């Protein structure tokens, strides 16, 4: 089984910066904080060591999670019915967000469970 080779540290750092730009586009405060955190971790591990490949792999996996799983919401000002203020949020879903159906989640919990239709718990 072939595995993909790990990028070098600079490539992983650039990959992480691109992922933060995609995930936090339009939110300068969070973008700046995420990039500062990435910089801090890369500076702490500037020297090559035994665990360098592990740190690079962590950066690559973090970038993948940021790019495919982080969705930001922005509060939308709007009036509810009869003067009640309603809290509404607009999600920024970009083309890199992982989309899928819930079929695997719905069927995952049903493995090995037999339910009798029409019976209550006390009748089983």
UniProtKB/Swiss-Prot annotation:
Pfam families: Complex1_LYR. InterPro entries: Complex1_LYR_dom, Complex1_LYR_LYRM7, MZM1/LYRM7. It is found in: Mitochondrion matrix. One of its GO terms (molecular function) is protein folding chaperone. The keyword Ribosomal protein does not apply. Belongs to the complex I LYR family. MZM1 subfamily. This is Mitochondrial zinc maintenance protein 1, mitochondrial. It comes from Paracoccidioides brasiliensis (strain Pb18). The gene is MZM1.
